[in-house]
Amino acid sequence: MSFKKIIAIVLSVLILLSLLIFGFVRYLDTNRDIIISEAKIATGVDSQMLPIKVTNFFPKNTEKISAWISWRNAKINTQLLVKWHYVTDDIPIYDYSLTIPKKEGVANVVLAMPEGKSLPSGLYKVDILLGKKRLIKTLTFEIQ
């Protein structure tokens, strides 16, 4: 077999593999129950449910943190699980189940301390899962 034929076969196989992989990734992307278009950590939300003071760093004595989530192309009644975790001491804090009510929208999940108390200093993360297993997004933040 000539060198040109070997190169042609190798290139054909590579092109075929690329098409198969691209097609599979595209299939996975179009067959989701939901697409998280944005997810942000903020101090809260305004009257239009938009995040206020988006940041990943919060001062000492912070009492409340918001995890704001925007989605699209959702199947109605899709279940999300929002898991708050104190990374510094590896402590799970709070799990919140969210049932998606419409194809497109936003949600705000709040972690708040009782009045007069503040969240401990350290590193935190928020995992957003489809159902209880499939991780969709992780957000991180720090309290000084």
Role assignments for model-derived ranges:
Residues 9-22:
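Hydrophobic membrane-insertion alpha-helices, especially the h-region
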Residues 25-121, 127-137:
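Contiguous segments within soluble domain cores/interaction surfaces
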Residues 1-7:
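Short, low-complexity patches enriched in S/T/P/G
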Residues 7-8, 29:
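Sequence-pattern detector for short linear motifs
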